[in-house]
């Protein structure tokens, strides 16, 4: 590993992990020196560190957190973020409000301490300007790289003890520049509008100056040539439970079970929660007992409808290391579970969401890159919950909106990143029968004044 020490304005020294001093051009920007060192040592990991942080850094953790080639990490002990809370007017993804207690996915990087592989750095050579503002350079690189498969994290393990040092803060001019260069132009106007309405500020000169910069959205960066194989282990027992909430889809669920029975890596047990809100109704899933299955089936029948409740009932019965959260109207290939676990091993991720599309979904609209996901798929994901088996869906969102996203937030706040992979793909049949097709009467539906947006949206 090569470490680049700096004082926020320029590089002060560069040393290797064997304490060899490496020459550099002190007149260049920190970003330029970083890129030059990456070109000089393309097979090394590169770290940057503010000189005031040197005594607080946990260098032993770097090989552990940089466990595969497409990882970029940094950490700032400060509550303040470089781009400020105003960036929340532009982006509402989970990557903005960072949990500093755990390893957390975010493109918001810090110049204080961080690192990545030189092989990734060189892919940005000539693509983005190696400017004097090192924090801007790092944030730009992470923001552009994340949708292309670069896994970016705030990692508190980089410090032994958190130092009390201020986080550099972007000016309002820099903030507007960042928004214009990395988002659609309409967000620049919306941020100006929000600052006017909610903060009584009118930074018109920052707004106008931002329009002079060049966009960075289509600059031809590709990370596909970089091989990923994590040195970290997340698959030990390789046991899998499948949970399936179902309502009124007997034939579709049967096909799902048949697909599971043909798996090259069989699940240990399949947990089915069958719902029928009609009083006096009984289970219609006779084939659960009438046929032989190569896995244990746990069947729960309930009159209480609701996907959140059903999934929670299923999660309480999980015994395996991994959980495949499935739907009752999907189809999967015979090697689905095997390939899913192989991907989890490759990236050492504890939560994987798979591409899940209908048969007529346009091929050109499908996501083709592996990347950190800003949501979560409750019917198309595998998750390692062995250490976090207390996690449950929030029933406040029952029959509403966003329970998938909220469960994903719970995972991230436990230090579990959600990674999307396009393969193996799940076919979603979107069954025309069953499911939750009766519109529920929620608490606020009979109110004279209807809340807009609805409480579940505002939640």
Predicted regions and their residues:
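N-proximal low-complexity "stem/linker" segments adjacent to membrane-targeting elements
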Residues: 1-18, 160-161, 197, 201-262
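Acidic donor-binding segment of Leloir-type glycosyltransferases
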Residues: 8-10, 19-23, 257-301
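Glycine-rich, basic loop-to-helix element that forms the pyrophosphate-binding segment
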Residues: 25-39, 299-318
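A recurrent flexible, glycine/aromatic-enriched loop bordering the glycosyltransferase active site
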Residues: 79-82, 92-116, 366-383, 442-448
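Acidic donor-binding loop at a coil-to-helix junction in glycosyltransferase catalytic cores
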Residues: 132-140, 400-409, 421
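Cell-envelope/extracellular polymer assembly enzymes that use nucleotide-activated donors
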Residues: 140, 238-243, 269, 406
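Active-site-adjacent helix/loop segment of glycosyltransferases
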Residues: 148-214, 428-459
């Amino acid at each position: 590993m090569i470490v680049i020490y700096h004082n926020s304005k320029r590089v002060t020294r560069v040393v290797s992990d064997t304490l060899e001093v490496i020459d550099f051009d002190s007149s260049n920007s920190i970003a330029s020196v970083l890129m030059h060192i990456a070109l000089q040592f393309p097979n090394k990991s590169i770290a940057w560190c503010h000189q005031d942080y040197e005594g607080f850094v946990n260098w032993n953790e770097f090989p552990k957190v940089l466990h595969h080639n497409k990882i970029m990490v940094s950490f700032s002990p400060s509550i303040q973020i470089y781009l400020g809370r105003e960036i929340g007017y532009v982006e509402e993804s989970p990557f903005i409000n960072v949990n500093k207690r755990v390893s957390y996915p975010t493109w918001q990087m810090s110049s204080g301490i961080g690192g990545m592989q030189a092989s990734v750095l060189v892919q940005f050579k000539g693509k983005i300007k190696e400017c004097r503002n090192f924090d801007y350079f790092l944030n730009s690189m992470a923001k552009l790289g994340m949708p292309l498969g670069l896994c970016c994290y705030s990692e508190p393990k980089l410090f032994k003890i958190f130092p009390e040092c201020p986080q550099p803060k972007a000016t309002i001019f820099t903030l507007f520049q960042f928004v214009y260069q990395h988002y659609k132009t309409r967000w620049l106007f919306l941020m100006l509008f929000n600052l006017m309405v909610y903060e009584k500020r009118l930074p018109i000169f920052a707004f106008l100056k931002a329009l002079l910069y060049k966009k960075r959205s289509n600059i031809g960066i590709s990370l596909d040539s970089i091989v990923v194989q994590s040195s970290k282990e997340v698959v030990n027992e390789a046991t899998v439970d499948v949970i399936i909430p179902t309502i009124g889809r007997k034939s579709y669920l049967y096909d799902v079970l048949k697909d599971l029975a043909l798996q090259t890596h069989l699940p240990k047990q399949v947990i089915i929660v069958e719902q029928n809100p009609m009083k006096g109704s009984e289970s219609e899933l006779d084939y659960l007992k009438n046929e032989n299955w190569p896995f244990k089936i746990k069947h729960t029948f309930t009159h209480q409808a609701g996907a959140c409740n059903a999934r929670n009932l299923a999660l309480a019965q999980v015994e395996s290391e991994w959980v495949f959260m499935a739907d009752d109207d999907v189809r999967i290939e015979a090697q689905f579970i095997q390939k899913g676990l192989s991907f989890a091993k490759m990236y050492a991720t504890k939560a994987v969401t798979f591409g899940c599309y209908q048969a007529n979904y346009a091929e050109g609209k499908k996501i083709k890159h592996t990347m950190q996901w800003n949501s979560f798929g409750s019917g198309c994901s595998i998750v390692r919950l062995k250490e976090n088996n207390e996690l449950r869906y929030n029933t406040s969102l029952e029959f509403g909106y966003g329970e998938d996203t909220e469960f994903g937030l719970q995972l991230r706040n436990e230090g579990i990143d959600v990674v999307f992979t396009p393969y193996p793909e799940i076919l979603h049949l979107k069954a025309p029968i069953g499911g939750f097709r009766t519109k529920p009467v929620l608490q606020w539906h009979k109110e004279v004044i209807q809340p807009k947006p609805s409480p579940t949206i505002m939640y």
